[in-house]
Amino acid sequence: MRDIYVIGSASIDLVVKSDRRPLKGETILGESFFMTTGGKGSNQAVSASRLGGKVRMVGAVGADDFGQQIIENLKENKVDVSNVESVTHVSSGTAHITLSEDDNSIIVVPGANFAVTTHQVEQVLNEAAEDAIVILQNEIPKDVILFIIDKCDELGLTTIYNPAPFIEIELDYLNKVTYFTPNETEVKELFGEDYEAIIKAYPNKMIVTLGDKGAVFYNDQLVNVPGIKADVVDTTGAGDTFNGALAVALSKNMALEDAILFANKAASISVTGLGAQGGMPYREVMTDV
């Protein structure tokens, strides 16, 4: 099995559940509050590990209680944390999440996630096996993201680039990644409303996720990989589950369409639990894929 490296954020999620979102200047009463581990990188690492991947996390946390919780959670989920650094000059990253109306909205405070450096990443990638898979997202500094893409391209490593949260990026970098996995909102921010032509321009590379409608990519023709309906409790982390699952499927040399179907299945299960990682499935429940 190929190694999976997740380079990215590891945070604590501070979650409020309410029946609606407040209007500007309004205070409302929430239904409940809880804290859980999160961050897109950490979520993707946990997703991949639970589904049977051999996963290493690369990132940074603060030297604080939150940082310790993040590390312990990764260890409990059998993720290698030897490349997660503890820094003293900034606190651990946090995400402030509102759950309402069967969806979520999130404000991210990067904290230690912005302490990830090109030097740290370069050391790790230089030691990676040539068939390793690298997952990255946009919750670490942009210069580090671009460095990772360039370095992986130089080393011939397989990359899954999940461009969330949205940042402006030169399109030349898309030619250097193996797989590019925006959701429908992100692809519209990058390319405008009519993005089907763009998908065709990146065959077997651009995979646009469409929530419960599944995902679409181009392979001689537009391929719609169906989603799976689920009883939604919390959509937080569904995209991260998808990307972690996609990496696992590819690490087992599944064909791309089958890998996306596997990832859709995992994402559909993830929304039935509370919290970004609460509903993430283990391999044994993925019996029909």
Positions of predicted regions on the chain:
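Gly/Ala-rich phosphate-binding loop of Rossmann-like dinucleotide-binding domains
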Residues: 49-50, 153, 251
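Glycine-rich phosphate/adenosyl-contacting loop at the front of the ribokinase-like
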Residues: 1-60, 65-69, 76, 232, ...
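Conserved N-terminal subdomain of the carbohydrate kinase-like
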Residues: 24-27, 35, 50-132, 287-289
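Conserved phosphate/ATP/ADP-binding segment of small-molecule kinases
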Residues: 149, 155-226
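Conserved phosphate-binding/catalytic region of the ribokinase-like
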Residues: 4, 195-289
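Glycine- and other small-residue-rich loops at beta-strand/loop junctions that grip anionic moieties
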Residues: 59, 136-138, 162
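Structural motif
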Residues: 3, 132-133, 179
